[in-house]
Design a protein with these regions (language model features):
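Short Lys/Arg-rich amphipathic alpha-helical segments
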Residues: 1-154
Length: 154
């Protein structure tokens, strides 16, 4: 493979991660000035250890060398999504109902593009977020990015 897209990379990475008994949370691929980075996030009910990341990294390195989806040199990182995890798919929000989230929209809605508040529901491809005393119903198709936004001060 000469070039890579997120979909192509996921087709290669997901089965390897899941075959090792982990949940594939998502991936990021960035290439800037010849410095490319493939970051893969894995999850497990019992949590993720450094050894887990090393094991997945070793296996992915072999698979990626064979499949060769990235034509240039790149660095591979495998990690847990962490407490302030990024959401990659709508279904991932469902797990965090009741938690603080930060959602950025593609275009402004009600005078704002960023909504930081408590995720109160997910239904029908829509996120319901309670922000500053108001409940907002945001269609997922409007969402550009989202993440858990822990309140470390509480």
């Amino acid at each position: 493979m000469a070039s890579s897209s997120h979909a192509q990379l996921e087709e290669i990475v997901r089965p390897t991660v899941e075959g090792l008994g982990f949940e594939f949370w998502g991936l990021e691929y960035h290439s800037q000035s010849g410095n490319a980075l493939l970051r893969v996030y894995i999850e497990a009910e019992a949590g993720i250890s450094v050894d887990d990341c090393a094991e997945v990294s070793r296996q992915l390195s072999v698979v990626l060398d064979v499949e060769d989806p990235i034509s240039s040199e790149y660095r591979l990182e495998v990690s847990s999504p962490g407490a302030a995890r990024v959401f990659f798919r709508y279904e991932q929000y469902q797990r965090f109902v009741g938690e603080r989230v930060k959602v950025k929209l593609r275009q402004a809605f009600d005078g704002r593009k960023t909504f930081t508040g408590v995720l109160t529901a997910t239904a029908n491809e829509e996120l319901t977020i309670f922000v500053d005393g108001h409940e907002y119903h945001l269609p997922y198709e409007w969402v550009d990015s989202g993440r858990v936004f822990p309140d470390y001060g509480a």
